Amino acid sequence: VLTRMTGQQVDVIGSGRTDAGVHAIGQVANFHLKQPRNTGELLDGLNRYLPEDIAVSSLTEVDGRFHSRYQAVCKTYRYRIHTGAVPDVFARRYVYDYRIPLDVERMREAAGLLLGEHDFKSFCGNTRMKKSTVRTLYEIRVEEHESEIDLFFTGNGFLQNMVRILT
């Protein structure tokens, strides 16, 4: 879309990839333009031409050395588990439906064991991973709601399917 809008080859670099079925909020990306453009016009154009399931909330000009992936401070995954007796058909694409009672206190205890720097190779969906599988989890928060349990994983990065497997 940017190449079509600007008439120049534009490579977009995201701060990370998402697994299939994962929705990203606050995903950061960067790109370089040879000629400066009005950020408001770029933002309007992007939201006009991008697929309907992608929206750009803001666009900011930054230093040319900025790299969205290598300068990300942390990333947070939210994993939602629907625990109600009746499936939520409206949220089915966004939550995991699990109607067996869960022990939230034990989940919190187990989460504490995962904090810190560890080799998460056993929790990676890609068995042929060539890069380091060592990651640091800074926080795991388990929140209980009326018919849903939300798990928030904050770390320096995540492996393919790591959060889904940990959950």
Explain the meaning of each model-derived region.
Residues 1-167:
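Structured-RNA-binding interfaces characteristic of tRNA pseudouridine synthases
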